[in-house]
């Protein structure tokens, strides 16, 4: 699948100091890139009330993604208690 990153997502990941967490994010991005469809992505769940918004769970953190026109946009990254206030 084609993958793109928003500036917000890139800034949130750059601020991270936890290298293990950065590695988990990289693994999630890799799994999206090799997936043939959304059903092939592990830990993916559709957000209710939104047609194109999904989240990927990585421990206590969530990656907010948008799926539009066969492109996956990595849009946000935050702790599980904060992600739903800022995304989508």
Predicted regions and their residues:
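Arg/Lys-rich, positively charged N-terminal/basic patches that mediate binding to nucleic acids
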Residues: 1-28
């Amino acid at each position: 699948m084609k993958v793109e990153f928003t500036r917000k997502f890139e800034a949130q990941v750059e601020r991270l100091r936890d290298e293990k967490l950065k590695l988990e994010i990289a693994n999630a991005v890799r799994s999206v890139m090799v997936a043939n469809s959304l059903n092939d992505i592990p830990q993916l769940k559709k957000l209710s009330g939104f047609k194109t918004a999904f989240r990927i769970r990585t421990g206590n953190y969530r990656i907010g993604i948008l799926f539009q026109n066969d492109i996956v946009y990595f849009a946000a990254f935050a702790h599980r208690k904060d992600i739903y206030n800022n995304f989508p």
